[in-house]
Amino acid sequence: MPFKPLSVLPTAALTVALTTALTVALAGAPASARAETIRVAIGTQDTTINCATGGLLIRELKLLEKYLPRDGRYKEVRYDIQWKNFTSGAPLTSEMVADKLDIGSMADFPGSNNGAAFLKAGKRSVFITVLSGSTLGSGNGIVVPRDSKVTLLSELKGHTISVPFASTAHGMLLRAVAAQGWDPQKDVTIITQAPEVAGPALQAGRIEAHADFVPFVELFEHRGVARKIYDGAQANAPTYHGSLVSADYAARYPEVVVAFLRAALEADRLIAAEPEKYSLLIEQVTGIDAAVNYLYHGPLGLQTRDLTWKPEYRQALRTSIETLKLMGRDSPLNADSFIDDRYIRAAFKQSGLDYEQRLVNRDKLPLKAVDATTGRPITDVQRAAGIWVQGEPKVRHYASIENALADLRRIEAAGGKARAVYVHDLIHRIKLLAPTSWYAIDAKGQLSAFLQRDAAAAYAAANRGRVLDFAGAKAAGSTAL
């Protein structure tokens, strides 16, 4: 459903000094834009919550208006800002190719489709920034119905797996199937199914497994209809969501593109400082539970917001272009020319940020907190946990799962309720929803969390322990402290 254009805020004139990296783009720009109306039509994917800093937050907080150029060649310009929301990248791409949109955000795989579609139409689009991603591959995953006995991807041979067609999850699924040594045409049946259809189907047990992208795997888990058995991190295949722009538009209005990216950088700063506040805003706009939004956007999140073109993300795009061939969609698209980092580098410079410093930083958003039960700083996050208590503005943090679950028992005994409980997979270092995770308790009573039961069992066997589900872990953790 399209959003109404947002009004332009009356702000002071902004001096826009592009870096020398934009000289070529500026050389081809018109000498004057006086009395011109410039359309800034942006396609968003609001429910794809890791795109929030390139769409939803910019729109809701009116950040674009703050940075659009209003002096020099833009002194007399009127901006026609348009927003349109999509549930996936494919229809967004169609409207970009049809020149109904100028900028859009999507993942690496649908982004490669975007570039290929532009080339087929005799045009070009360029990938201008990453918004959020995982150098390991988290963000895509495979779930089964909550009560399914399937615990591993290998158990799905000969079965049916649904997935949103041409999505980044589709690309992940094809690569995961190939890694199993399976023929995707013979050893597994892959059918197309949108998230809004898959949710009820999982709940009713009408599908055996479903692959999806941010945030639906975790949303289905959180709402109790599914259980994740495979995370993209297991394939060690980097993935990201980012923003693209029509190359012609960027050449005509490079300062407008940089303004959009400066707005994205501010959105990133705001959500990093107050992840709970903006997770609630995302829930208000999209209906995606704040607990799931925080799983991605909070400290040590399942993905990391990152607006730099790390080598892993460049490789992710190359892999996505190669995956097109698995679908019979060969294209002359080249990742090196498809990515254009001049605009994001200029945005960093104008925002007083060091692009090169961020480029080499692979750390997740750090956790700077004290244990809610002991008051001591949390210095080792390997077994850190968190509880977002319903009605509380901030997540409580803990140095151990035992401390968290002991506190959870006290919260519930006092009539409180947890909006969410978070733990971290000991092997893959990814943030998990505690109720659907597996646990191993060792001989010393220390709890460790795992995505998969077999990993928990292996750890328990090696440490004279036993495997527990969440209920068992709660009972064990209640005796901590």
What are these regions, as identified by a protein language model?
Residues 26-35:
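Sec/Tat signal peptide C-region and signal peptidase I cleavage site
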